[in-house]
C-alpha cells in the first residue's frame, strides 16, 4: 500500500489539513493517509492544548473519511518526536508499505535543519503541497513530488485567535472538531 503521512501539532486540525490530505491522496495515488499528531513537537516550546486533547481532535477530524486514520506512534515516546525516528519505526513495523511524507512546499526551505535530514532524505519521498503559482527549492538529495493545492488561507493560529475573540470557526474546522473545542472551552480567553 502507498501511505501518505501527515505530521503536525494539529492545535486544532482544520479543513486545510484535510484538503491537503485529500489532494495528496488523489495526486500521489495513495491508498490512505495517516495523521501523525506530535506528542512533543521538537519545533515548539509548548502547545496550547494538551497532547491527549489534540489527539482526540484529530480523531474527530478524520472519523468520517475511511481513507484517513490517526497513528499514535509519536505518543509512544516520552521524548520529542522527530520525523526521522517516526519514519524509521513505521518502515520497520510496516515493511510492505511505501510511505510519502506530506509537507507544505514552504517548509522545504527549512527541511535541511530537521533532525538527521540527510538520512531522512534517503528514508522517504516527500509530497510537497504547493500553493498555485508558488516556486520552491528542493533540498539536494531530497526526493520530492509536487502536490497542487487550491489557495486556502486557514491556519491553526488564526482559528485559536478567532475563538479567543468570540468569532465563529464554523466551516474552518470539521463540525465534530468545532463541537469539541466548544465543549472543552479550548482557546477561549
From Swiss-Prot:
The UniProt entry, under CDD domains, shows:
NMNAT
InterPro entries per the UniProt record, alphabetical: Cyt_trans-like, NadD/NMNAT, Rossmann-like_a/b/a_fold
- So what EC number does this one have? 2.7.7.18
Biological or metabolic pathway of the protein: Cofactor biosynthesis; NAD(+) biosynthesis; deamido-NAD(+) from nicotinate D-ribonucleotide: step 1/1
Choose any GO biological process term that the UniProt entry carries and state it.
Answer: NAD biosynthetic process
Superkingdom to which the source organism belongs: Bacteria
Q: Name one GO molecular function term.
A: nicotinate-nucleotide adenylyltransferase activity
Q: Which UniProt keywords apply?
A: ATP-binding, NAD, Nucleotide-binding, Nucleotidyltransferase, Pyridine nucleotide biosynthesis, Transferase
Report which reactions are catalysed by this protein.
nicotinate beta-D-ribonucleotide + ATP + H(+) = deamido-NAD(+) + diphosphate
Task: State whether keyword NAD applies.
Answer: yes
In the record, the note on similarity to other proteins reads:
Belongs to the NadD family.
User: What is its biological role?
Assistant: Catalyzes the reversible adenylation of nicotinate mononucleotide (NaMN) to nicotinic acid adenine dinucleotide (NaAD).
Looking up PANTHER family in the UniProt record yields: NICOTINATE-NUCLEOTIDE ADENYLYLTRANSFERASE-RELATED, PHOSPHOPANTETHEINE ADENYLYLTRANSFERASE
What is this protein's name? Probable nicotinate-nucleotide adenylyltransferase
Amino acid at each position: 500500500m502507498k501511505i501518505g503521512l501527515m505530521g503536525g501539532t494539529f492545535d486544532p486540525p482544520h479543513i486545510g489539513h484535510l484538503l491537503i490530505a485529500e489532494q495528496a491522496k488523489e495526486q500521489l495515488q495513495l491508498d490512505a493517509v495517516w495523521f501523525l499528531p506530535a506528542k512533543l513537537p521538537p519545533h515548539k516550546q509548548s502547545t496550547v492544548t494538551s497532547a491527549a486533547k489534540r489527539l482526540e481532535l484529530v480523531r474527530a477530524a478524520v472519523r468520517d473519511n475511511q481513507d484517513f486514520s490517526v497513528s499514535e506512534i509519536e505518543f509512544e515516546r516520552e521524548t520529542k518526536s522527530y520525523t526521522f525516528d517516526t519514519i524509521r519505526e513505521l518502515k520497520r513495523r510496516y515493511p510492505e508499505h511505501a510511505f510519502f511524507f506530506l509537507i507544505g512546499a514552504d517548509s522545504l526551505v527549512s527541511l535541511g535543519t530537521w533532525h538527521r535530514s540527510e538520512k531522512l532524505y534517503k528514508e522517504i519521498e516527500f509530497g510537497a503541497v504547493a500553493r498555485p503559482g508558488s516556486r520552491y527549492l528542493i533540498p539536494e538529495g531530497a526526493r520530492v513530488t509536487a502536490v497542487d493545492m487550491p489557495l486556502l488561507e486557514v491556519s491553526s493560529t488564526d482559528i485559536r485567535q478567532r475563538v479567543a475573540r468570540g468569532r465563529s470557526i464554523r466551516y474552518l474546522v470539521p463540525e465534530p472538531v468545532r463541537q469539541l473545542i466548544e465543549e472543552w472551552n479550548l482557546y477561549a480567553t
